[in-house]
UniProtKB/Swiss-Prot annotation:
It catalyses: Exonucleolytic cleavage in either 5'- to 3'- or 3'- to 5'-direction to yield nucleoside 5'-phosphates. This is Exodeoxyribonuclease 7 large subunit. The gene is xseA. Heterooligomer composed of large and small subunits. One of its GO terms (molecular function) is exodeoxyribonuclease VII activity. Bidirectionally degrades single-stranded DNA into large acid-insoluble oligonucleotides, which are then degraded further into small acid-soluble oligonucleotides. Belongs to the XseA family. NCBIfam families: xseA.
Length: 451
């Protein structure tokens, strides 16, 4: 001690400094448990409180840098465990703890593991709303994962029978607390997912201490819910109890009974909604029928309207035709009367017109007679010339037994002197044609061979 102090008599400051050194050097790294009292939170974000038990208390200060790491704010009466620098505030000689870390009393490593797993799941997006599966509106089968001895099972089954007795229920039994229960709960969830017998799955248990509910904070249960192909509704504990299973489930209910109400349609509500739907459907159908009738009437009027127009146009055309006929008749009568008047006037002016007309008629008759005689003579002459031409026509000559012989260039062969043995010829008869070849010399019989 003499090495630390200058004399055996200590000053107050020396005493406090010595005590501070001892505390900081020998009590580092300890966890101290107690109840929060006299809690004050400064505007700066610092916490000042006393940590007490039944026989003593110690002043604590937790500065903002450490306070921001709290999972939730401190409150009066919290039972916690703190770790930090145990020391003395020298100016007043007050014993205090400068707190660096806080955890709930009794949870220790479990709570720390809880926070780590929660942070990991949060980072993985396991709590994200977009990964939540929607619950079926009217499930055909409901599954329940819980203990057969649990009061929660009776509550859920009673609620389902009351609200939707027609929906079958399948129970996947498992212990819900105790050593190894988390593995059995996870296996029951996996079994329900693999069998795919139900449309929605309730994972539930009744209320209890945090230790009783802890299995639903374990990673096997959380991962089983996350990977389940069936929508999962959690109903663990009471409304104020939250577990990691609640965060990762597709829907969280405050209680097991609440979970049953979430997954089951209420019979009375369903009947009421059905009646409302029928009423709305009837209204819609009546309105559509009325609209269709109105449209049909309008279309019928539109169909009659063109017929009326056609009738009107037909009547108008008839009137116009009558007017035109009357006008033409009047014009003809007028011009006829005018022509007759002019004819009579012309007769009076030229008395010899009638004589000239008679001469013209006589001349016309004589001209017509002479034309017919000339036409008859011309026809007779044409017939005689046609007969003469027919008599001397090549075809007529051929019909009398003659033929025409041509070489390959189409030239007519008039005598046999020009023919050569083997020469090709073309012969035309009255009833056909053929090709031949000269086979013998001139003067021999059978001069030609047919090809």
């Amino acid at each position: 001690m003499s090495d630390f102090f200058h004399s055996d008599v200590l000053s107050v400051s020396e005493l406090n400094a010595f005590a501070k050194s001892l505390l900081e050097n020998h009590l580092a790294g300890l966890w101290i448990a107690g109840e929060v009292s006299n809690l004050t939170r400064a505007a700066s974000g610092h916490y000042y409180f006393s940590l007490k038990d039944s026989r003593a208390q110690v002043r604590c200060a937790m500065f903002k840098g450490a306070a921001v790491r709290l999972a939730k704010p401190l409150k009066e009466g919290d039972h916690i465990e703190v770790s930090g620098k145990i020391s003395i505030y020298e100016a007043r000689g007050e014993f205090q703890i400068t707190v660096n870390e806080v955890r709930l009393k009794g949870l220790g490593q479990l709570y720390e593991a809880y926070e780590r797993l929660k942070a990991q799941l949060q980072a993985e997006g396991a709590f994200a709303a977009e990964r939540k599966k929607p619950l079926p509106v009217r499930p055909q089968c409901i599954g329940i994962v819980t203990s057969l001895a649990a009061a929660a099972l009776r509550d859920v089954v009673t609620t389902l029978k009351r609200r939707a007795p027609e929906i079958p229920v399948i129970v996947y039994p498992t212990p819900v607390q105790g050593a190894g229960s988390e593995l059995q709960i996870a296996q029951a969830i996996k079994t329900a997912s693999q069998r795919a017998e139900c449309d929605v799955l309730i994972v539930c248990r009744g209320g209890g201490s945090i230790e009783d509910l802890w299995a639903f904070n374990e990673e096997p249960v959380v991962r089983a819910i996350e990977s389940c192909t069936v929508p999962v509704v959690s109903g663990v504990g009471h409304e104020t109890d939250f577990t990691l299973a609640d965060f990762v489930a597709d829907m969280r209910a405050p209680t097991p009974t609440g979970a049953a109400e979430l997954v089951s349609p209420n019979r009375q509500e369903s009947l009421h909604r059905l009646a409302q739907a029928q009423c709305r459907l009837k209204t819609v159908l009546e309105q559509r029928y009325f609209d269709a009738s109105q449209k049909l009437d309008w279309l019928a009027r539109q169909i009659r309207h063109p017929r009326q127009k056609l009738d009107e146009q037909r009547a108008s055309i008839g009137k116009l035709a009558q007017t035109l006929s009357y006008s033409m008749t009047q014009n003809v009568r007028t011009h006829t009367a005018r022509f007759e008047r002019q004819t009579q006037a012309l007769k009076h002016c030229r008395p010899d017109v009638s004589v000239c007309k008679k001469n013209i008629d006589r001349f016309q008759t004589a001209l017509s007679h002479a034309f017919h005689q000339l036409l008859t003579h011309r026809r007779q002459s044409l017939t005689a010339q046609a007969a003469l031409l027919e008599a001397v026509s090549p075809q007529h000559i051929l019909e009398r037994g003659f033929s025409v012989v041509k070489n390959t260039r189409g030239q007519v062969i008039r005598n046999a002197d020009v023919l050569k043995q083997g020469q090709k010829l073309h012969i035309i008869f009255a009833d056909g044609e053929t090709d031949v070849r000269v086979s013998k010399e001139q003067g021999q019989q059978d001069l030609f061979d047919c090809i």
